[in-house]
Amino acid sequence: MSLQMLIKPEKLAFSIYRQFPKFKPRQFEEARRGDLERDFLFLLKKCISVNQLRQIQAQMLLHSVEKPNFLIPKAVELGDFNYSSFLFSVTEEPNHYSFNYMIRGLTNTWNDHEAALSLYRRMKFSGLKPDKFTYNFVFIACAKLEEIGVGRSVHSSLFKVGLERDVHINHSLIMMYAKCGQVGYARKLFDEITERDTVSWNSMISGYSEAGYAKDAMDLFRKMEEEGFEPDERTLVSMLGACSHLGDLRTGRLLEEMAITKKIGLSTFLGSKLISMYGKCGDLDSARRVFNQMIKKDRVAWTAMITVYSQNGKSSEAFKLFFEMEKTGVSPDAGTLSTVLSACGSVGALELGKQIETHASELSLQHNIYVATGLVDMYGKCGRVEEALRVFEAMPVKNEATWNAMITAYAHQGHAKEALLLFDRMSVPPSDITFIGVLSACVHAGLVHQGCRYFHEMSSMFGLVPKIEHYTNIIDLLSRAGMLDEAWEFMERFPGKPDEIMLAAILGACHKRKDVAIREKAMRMLMEMKEAKNAGNYVISSNVLADMKMWDESAKMRALMRDRGVVKTPGCSWIEIEGELMEFLAGSDYLQCGREDSGSLFDLLVEEMKRERYEFGYIHL
């Protein structure tokens, strides 16, 4: 006797209808037709939550319908990693459909790309042959991990199954090779596509943009238009990334106008890219305008605007927007929290940083590698090395940025020995950023020989090419040690053109050491730099000339500063009062501090100082 004869469809429909009140009776009339498996497939199509899916699974078990391959795609579609993994683990023989959905979920939804590749290998080991859908997501995973070796191996297997000419797979291959730094090969694949569509152009333009080949992306975009292809949202998003890289505000504005002309809606994806582009180009007003125009603002849009404020030194605005985001009910993710922590570190907002750590714990994000690295960086910049070390040691996984943050925290707080010991412990290959922290530690501690040794080890042991920041550190190290001749010789060895920061280190030492010959050469070089915008260098040079009783030359240096439009950046301080960050600028009035009562508070403080008989000069805030 069949299962269908034992259990009436009406009874099954009524049982599930009680738990699916949103399903209409008419839909169950349709569900009564056919066998039970078809009934369950019908219900799975209508399922809109994990809770409903669990109820369907319970009914399937109750009616002895063992079809876990039915459930896995819907669980992945609903985005529940734990439930999807459970269903997959209890499935004795997952089919193509289940493997493909799990690999897609791991790649696109859960960003566990290593697990996606592992599942691909398991699929092959089980005897199932990957198809074009499998390969697409495998190449995406390789791109995200920059696993060029695995990608090439999988690419070679396409020829065995006759998929080497599949257009959709080639699009994924272009992205993978570009992401892995093989831009030339990506372009070769693109040129071999005989019938290109918009997706083909987007793949190559996006590949160029993400790999940092912004000019090539621009050139290909123009060629795309010349050949009559209409750009879509993805095209504009990739081009906005290229504009950000080049700082090309004019083209960025034209792209926004193009989106309006072609009636490409301001989605959160496009809007967020516009915000980031305007932020990278320094146009904060336009970034905020786009943000305000967005009807639907998701977490990505909020984070993009907060990042713009943080990266442009507007920490107070970043904090305000973060609190506003939470009030609207949008929950922050690891990217949001790490951005806010960066803003906290830049202004020394320690108490707010502590609140963010508590908030991260509430969201179970305290061990997220980006959040934890942000905490290490924030505590280090706020002078709390012990707290930075606490977070660092508790991290289950550390990447290069984590080690760099802790080394830099030690270096900037004068703990050179600890910084160098930590560098020796480093379990991942160091980068040029790592050596900036290491050399900075040597500068703070006056470790001349060690600093020079680390500088040479960059290239001899680690194959890294020293950049201007590394040369500047060594010049600063030698200058502070009074080795001005050596510092000057070292600067002359720099393969590029010395900048004003290098000269600042030498001029500062000359001012203290009274080295006339070198300071004259340094000042002459500074005056020849038409692009020099560091006000401190002009002030130091003017003071040096004044010390030499060269009053006319000192005045000329100040005049040169004015002629070049160099303005001395006003002193700026921040203070946290009752959870509010107040900003004070030298020369500003009271109301710019963000509190109307700040002026009266300051007056009371002055009166209190008078009563305590403190001596002070004229103060103007």
From Swiss-Prot:
PROSITE patterns: PPR (PS51375). Residues 502-578 are annotated as: Type E motif. Pfam families: E_motif, PPR, PPR_2. Keywords: Repeat. It comes from the Eukaryota. GO terms for molecular function: RNA binding. GO terms for biological process: RNA modification. PPR repeats lie at residues 95-130, 131-165, 166-196, 197-231, 232-266, 267-297, 298-332, 333-367, 368-398, 399-429, 431-461, 467-497. Residues 579-610 are annotated as: Type E(+) motif. Belongs to the PPR family. PCMP-E subfamily. This is Pentatricopeptide repeat-containing protein At2g34400. It comes from Arabidopsis thaliana. The lineage of its organism: Eukaryota, Viridiplantae, Streptophyta, Embryophyta, Tracheophyta. The gene is PCMP-E23.
